[in-house]
Amino acid sequence: IAGQKDIALTLHLMKYKANSNAPEVDHPRYEIRNINYLSNDSDRIHLRHQVLLNATALREGRPYSAAALQRTYNNFARLQAVKYTNISFSEVPDSNQVTENGMERDSISRQMDCNIQISTNKPSTIAFQPEGTNTAGDLGAAASLTYTNRNLFRGSEQLSIELRGAYEAITGLEGYQDQNYTEYSVEGKLVFPRFLAPFLSRNFRRRQTANSELSASWNLQNRPEFHRRVFSTAWRYRWTEPRHHLAWRFDLLDLNYVYMPWISETFKRDYLDNAENRNAILRYNYEDLFIMKMGFGLSYSDGVDAVRVNVESSGNLLSGVSKAFGFKVNSQGQRT
């Protein structure tokens, strides 16, 4: 039949029979008696017990829930230290129950035990990645060495440290003593698979699929035109709501310090001090800067439509502090 049609659907749920000779009774609602954590790798699981509890949406003494089972799988999949998880249930054998008048009667057990088997990843890995570069005909090479620990404090915290070096032979520059570009950087990142913040209840932390991230980096660039040093550090939160296709990011604090120890006189004369080429944006990029910002981001994606919103505030808090302490203002209007 072409087109859309509405139909009425009626579901008749037959009562439960243990066997062909047993009477029909209401379907029992099973409760979880015990939750057991088992290791597939060794005698013990290399995760703190509280971490296991926070990742388990199933609860002892509560009815079985398919939604809670799926959330438990999802929560363990988020942990970088966990390789895979298998959850099985075993029904508690039928037992005698005591009625109100003290008589014993046989009844169908409504309890089952939950067994969560966990296999963990190797905690530490080292990766080396070489690169070849070609920037407008200038050939170069780069290499990075990354160390990762996926279970730093036995809570699936992930620590990564990356060392990187790059070299490029620059051609076609006139009036500069050095014709090579070198860059060295080190970056460290520590990710906690939970909210790290005061005044949050335990139930709130267990419900949220959040990450807390601390990062710091140092970058050294030596170009024929200038030398630049950049230090950055940030503390941010990320969490998701899969049912609503939402992802959130909150940058609580993001600090960036840019230091220019040396600028070539040729570069100053041709670009920064030349009246024809001089502009505020160009000069701003080659000054010593200290930037503090906060930011909030929201993204939505359902596989068809995608929306992203970002809001940032930079310098307001730092400006207020400098005014409160009476920092001096230089000729360019900057507080020092």
Name each region found by the language model.
Residues A127-N134, G140-L196, E213-S215:
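Predominantly transmembrane beta-strands of Gram-negative outer membrane beta-barrel pores used
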Residues L79-K83, I118-S124, N149-Q158, A197-P198, ...:
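Secondary-structure transition/capping motifs at alpha-helix termini
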Residues D6-A8, L53, R71, S109-D113, ...:
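Transmembrane beta-barrel architecture of outer membranes
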Residues A55-L58, T72-N75, L79, T146, ...:
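Generic, well-ordered alpha-helical scaffold segments in large soluble proteins
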Residues G3, D43-L47, T125, Y176-T336:
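Transmembrane beta-strand segments of outer-membrane beta-barrel domains in Gram-negative
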Residues I1-N134, R164, A169, N203:
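Periplasmic polypeptide-binding modules associated with outer-membrane biogenesis and secretion
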Residues P63-A67, G137-D138, Y176-N180, E225:
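Ordered, soluble secondary-structure elements with a strong preference for glycine-centered loop motifs
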